[in-house]
């Protein structure tokens, strides 16, 4: 408990510094950096409670889901071609990077594909664990570098490259007329959504369940739900960030360090491809470049949606692109692997 309290205090203080400099998702980034440094250099066995992470995702899911209305559904229906086209581009870039890595390193092609696809770290880890032909060390290392690289670099790119700015908000209490406690009434609804999604084995159920439950309530009841208070979202960011930072595995990174340059280059190519496709989406659909880039960024879904919230971007569009790509990855990748890599495949 002492370790967790120390990590929490350090993360909070670093988050205050990032908040002062108007950095997007400051407390999530501070949690990732603090936990990563502590685990890599001091407490190699440090873990963050899954329950705390899931409670953070519950709050984040409500904050994201409340942005869905009848109007956003109509708007999203106009993006069908863009959503699927963007997803195929992301998959294509990932496969090219995986093939290049396979040709120049010791890793087999199956492991490289699982490692580079932006389909969710947890999902790819589970697939690697269940398939004896895949090298779990390779998959986890590549996915970790991709996720950390994107989550840490994208907020800075959005600010300094695309000219976005963080929407002013209170640190602990809401500003303006966003006061009251009506948001508390929605927490049980979001919780039920999380439970149902887990029962249905939905990917990333702890996040998607609350999003879907909140969105359904907002659309069916035709109400504009209250924003969650900043203190709730900041605590959610801290717990999500600390959990992500504790996912860093020093031993895995050292065992697969020869793959590190390829993982970094692959991540940069994915980000570059995201910017290029975002420009196409801006010209075709007329959406802001920040929204388009966060929608295309190669994960994670939670982090990109929270970054969009902090910068006033259209979170419903960001979520639509991110969730469709996530579902495509989780539904098509296992089928593709079974068809292309038969039982005799040895790498």
In which residue ranges do the predicted regions lie?
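Membrane-embedded alpha-helical segments of transport systems
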Residues: 89-90, 120-124, 140-162, 301, ...
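Core mid-bundle transmembrane helix pairs that form the ion/substrate translocation pathway
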Residues: 8-12, 17-19, 163-223
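Structural signature of hydrophobic alpha-helical transmembrane segments
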Residues: 18-33, 52-56, 79-90, 112-116, ...
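Entry/N-cap segments of selected transmembrane alpha helices
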Residues: 4-6, 10, 68-99, 183, ...
């Amino acid at each position: 408990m002492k370790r967790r309290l120390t990590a929490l205090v350090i993360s909070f203080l670093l988050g205050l510094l990032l908040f002062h400099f108007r950095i997007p998702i400051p407390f999530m980034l501070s949690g990732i950096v603090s936990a990563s440094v502590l685990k890599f250099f001091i407490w190699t066995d440090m873990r963050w409670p899954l329950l705390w992470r899931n409670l953070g995702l519950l709050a984040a899911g409500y904050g994201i889901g409340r942005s869905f209305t009848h109007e956003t559904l109509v708007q999203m229906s106009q993006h069908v071609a863009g959503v699927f086209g963007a997803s195929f581009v992301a998959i294509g870039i990932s496969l090219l990077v995986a093939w290049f890595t396979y040709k120049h390193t010791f890793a087999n092609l199956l492991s490289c594909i699982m490692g580079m696809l932006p389909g969710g770290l947890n999902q790819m880890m589970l697939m690697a664990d269940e398939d004896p032909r895949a090298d779990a060390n390779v998959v986890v290392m590549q996915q970790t570098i991709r996720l950390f690289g994107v989550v840490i670099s994208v907020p800075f790119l959005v600010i300094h490259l695309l000219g976005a700015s963080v929407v002013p908000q209170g640190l602990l209490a809401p500003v303006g007329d966003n006061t009251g406690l009506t948001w508390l009434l929605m927490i049980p609804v979001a919780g039920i959504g999380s439970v149902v999604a887990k029962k249905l084995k939905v990917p990333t159920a702890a996040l998607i369940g609350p999003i879907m439950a909140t969105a359904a309530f907002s659309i069916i009841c035709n109400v504009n739900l209250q924003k969650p208070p900043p203190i709730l979202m900041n605590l959610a960011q801290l717990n999500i960030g600390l959990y992500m930072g504790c996912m860093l595995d020093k031993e895995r990174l050292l065992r697969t360090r020869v793959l590190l340059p390829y993982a970094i280059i692959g991540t940069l190519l994915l980000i570059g491809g995201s910017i290029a496709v975002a420009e196409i989406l801006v010209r075709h659909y007329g959406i802001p470049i920040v929204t388009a880039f966060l929608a295309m960024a190669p994960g994670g879904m939670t982090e990109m949606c929270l970054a969009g919230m902090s910068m006033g971007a259209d979170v419903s569009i960001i979520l639509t692109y991110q969730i469709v790509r996530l579902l495509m990855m989780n539904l098509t990748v296992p089928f593709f692997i079974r068809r292309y890599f038969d039982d005799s495949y040895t790498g």
